[in-house]
Regions:
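Short histidine/acidic/glycine/proline-rich micro-motifs that form metal-
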Residues: 9-12, 77-80, 121-125, 155-158
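Short, basic/glycine-rich phosphate-binding loops at helix/coil junctions
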Residues: 39-44, 114-116, 150-151
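Hydrophobic/aromatic beta-strand patches that form the interior of the parallel beta-sheet core
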Residues: 3-5, 29-31, 115-118, 147-150
């Protein structure tokens, strides 16, 4: 099963367009993180308490991720970072690591193939590389890794359709990867 964690603010924006081009003809679950609520992260590493409940949408999303074979993080580049909604979701991994119901969290994440789609407007193929590193390092902490990434260039609506490199790569991903 493929799960897309979409962190963009426009449902049909450039990031969504590029990601859907990759997935054309494949079955997938699209989770729009901007439509969900994530409470602030609770850091209990140095306390005697545990994470026993989530009073937001996080648990539903992480459970979906853990049932997936493939996960695609899809985000516009906002101020040289992934979107706040995607970052907030990733920050909650700290809670999952402290949740006794997810004792096998790292092992389960290691079995998933992760990919990243980014779209930005200010020299993104250079300036978005720290975003790639951010995701890669976060996954490495869990013993997982980023299998591939695609960075597209777009400033205005539908600009991504003029990024020949990104479109060709999206088509290649669509054929190459056994979604």
């Amino acid at each position: 099963m493929i799960t897309v964690l979409f962190g963009g603010s426009r449902e049909n924006g450039n990031t969504a367009t590029l990601t859907k081009k990759i997935l054309k003809g494949h079955d997938y679950q699209w989770i729009d993180l901007t439509k969900l609520a994530f409470n602030p992260v609770r850091d209990v590493r140095h306390e005697s308490s545990q994470i026993l409940e989530y009073n937001d949408d996080y648990q539903r999303v992480i459970d979906q991720v853990l049932e997936s074979d493939e996960v695609i993080f899809a985000s516009p580049v906002y101020w040289y970072s992934v979107s706040g909604t995607l970052k907030s979701f990733i920050d909650h991994w700290s809670e999952t690591l402290q949740d006794p119901r997810y004792q096998d969290f790292k092992e389960r994440m290691q079995k998933i193939t992760f990919r990243l789609v980014l779209v930005g407007g200010d020299s993104p193929r250079i300036k978005a590389l720290p975003c790639v590193q951010q995701i890669e390092y976060s996954l490495q902490f869990l013993g997982a890794h980023l299998a591939d990434y695609l960075i597209g260039y777009a400033e205005k609506p539908d600009d991504i359709l003029h990024d020949q490199y990104a479109i060709k790569e999206a088509e290649r991903w669509n054929k190459l990867y056994s979604f």
